[in-house]
């Protein structure tokens, strides 16, 4: 069963900021990052528990390249609440 995948406002802003940074660095890198995020969304829609358990109860993490998508189930859907570079101290939400 495919579920919906949504982003919190904060996660959407983080994703936008990362994409803008990558666009300045290299449009090709930004394009590859965006494609990887889309693949991750499809994976979560089909397999919502495919990420590793997060530190906080009820959360999970999915690694996408150098980034970590932190998410939780909201009813039947998946809510991504953080998008962080893996080297950030707070990436392990």
Annotate the PLM regions.
Residues 24, 64, 68, 72-93:
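Enriched for short, Lys/Arg-rich terminal
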